[in-house]
């Protein structure tokens, strides 16, 4: 489907017309959106174009581009490959699902390998606009909640272990850690000093561990319901784990892999009713198997995995190994299976993650914001994706 008909003029101004614009508080018709030099410069009542490049939306939705804070890979490529070609392939695939900004996410690995990936992202971000930084997931996590990550490489956070990582906080935007580990509180303090978002995950924490981490600045949890402690008995008392603490604390934002496999619709409904639209951040947690045909084999930093029936599995098929989803797939699931209004599902994929890592000019259709945009059909399929006003995908 070809939306852009007229030639770009010398002022590089585009006008998106005849669409349904999605804002945090609902959907509005009868508005034009103007883009100039990669920024949204006006949102106004429909008016005749004055020489701008017209993008006729033909009654489809126009939403902010999606922001994925947890993506390991796609198309056989992984963040730990640490090269620009892999990163470009990952971004190109996720653009088909409406993603315009993402945090490439590392695996539990030796510190040197993680730093190599971080350095590669820093270099690649000069040419790949979608790269917003790195999410370091491990190695400071719990072996008891390893999931698909390699427990043998998990370690306690010591200044010697994390000191080199702290030299790269210009690129590291988020770190997942287990709050119960000795030294975790000190690491949280150092991360906060350096402007890094802290997320509790792959954790066997008791509720007092979670509360201490919260008091020191943890404001997120990683892939809620997956690889985290839940309610259990301590002596004769039943107490909360990281899951229940996160659900009960209004300031904590919960990542959610809404692919219908990691978390059932009933659990997603429970989370939505507990946290609301501003307390849920949709993430794909996509691994290298995303976009590959069934039967494809891939690796999650040394762990053998396979794609089957549209999901990513460990090689022995015993558990999930990340997801094969794109952000649009998660939005569709939230609408179709959880009953979330479309504009709220969009917020979970845009404004909430933008807030989570301080992307102040992304995540909403607003004057002065980046022209990162996605055109969506009534069937909730991506028709076109724009980054900084430049079309990077068209169906």
Q: Which residues fall in each region the model found?
A:
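Alpha-helical scaffold segments that flank or form the walls of functional sites
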Residues: 60-61, 69, 79-130, 153-168, ...
């Amino acid at each position: 489907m070809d939306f852009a008909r007229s030639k770009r003029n010398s002022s590089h101004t585009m006008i998106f017309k005849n669409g349904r614009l999605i804002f945090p508080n609902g959907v509005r018709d009868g508005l034009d959106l103007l883009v100039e030099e990669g920024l949204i410069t006006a949102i106004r009542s429909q008016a005749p174009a004055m020489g701008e490049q017209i993008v006729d939306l033909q009654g489809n939705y126009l939403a902010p581009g999606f922001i994925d804070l947890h993506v390991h890979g796609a198309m056989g490529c992984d963040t730990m490959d640490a090269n620009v070609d892999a990163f470009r392939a990952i971004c190109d695939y996720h653009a088909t699902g409406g993603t315009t900004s993402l945090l490439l996410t590392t695996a539990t690995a030796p510190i040197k390998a993680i730093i190599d990936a971080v350095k590669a992202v820093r270099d690649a971000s000069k040419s790949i606009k979608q790269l917003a930084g790195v999410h370091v997931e491990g190695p400071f996590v719990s072996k008891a909640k390893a999931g698909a990550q390699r427990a043998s490489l998990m370690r306690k956070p010591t200044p010697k272990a994390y000191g080199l990582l702290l030299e790269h906080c210009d690129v590291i935007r988020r770190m997942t850690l287990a709050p119960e580990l000795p030294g975790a509180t000190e690491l949280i303090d150092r991360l906060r000093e350096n402007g890094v978002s802290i997320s509790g995950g792959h954790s066997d924490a008791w509720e007092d561990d979670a509360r201490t981490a919260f008091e020191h600045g943890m404001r997120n949890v990683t892939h809620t319901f997956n690889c985290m402690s839940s309610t259990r008995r301590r002596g004769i008392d039943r107490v909360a784990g990281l899951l229940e603490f996160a659900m009960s604390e209004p300031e904590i934002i919960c990542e959610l892999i809404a692919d219908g496999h990691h978390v059932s619709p009933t659990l997603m409904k429970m989370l939505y009713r507990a946290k609301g639209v501003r307390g849920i951040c949709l993430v794909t947690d996509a691994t290298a198997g995303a976009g590959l045909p069934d039967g494809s084999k891939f690796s999650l930093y040394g762990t053998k995995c396979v794609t089957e029936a549209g999901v990513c599995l460990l090689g022995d098929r015993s558990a999930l190994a990340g997801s094969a989803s794109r952000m649009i797939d998660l939005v569709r699931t939230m609408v179709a299976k959880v009953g979330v209004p479309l504009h709220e599902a969009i917020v979970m994929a845009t404004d909430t993650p933008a807030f989570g890592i301080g992307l102040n000019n992304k995540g909403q259709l607003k004057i002065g914001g980046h022209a990162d945009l996605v055109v969506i059909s009534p069937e909730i399929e991506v028709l076109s994706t724009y980054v900084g006003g430049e079309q990077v995908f068209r169906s």
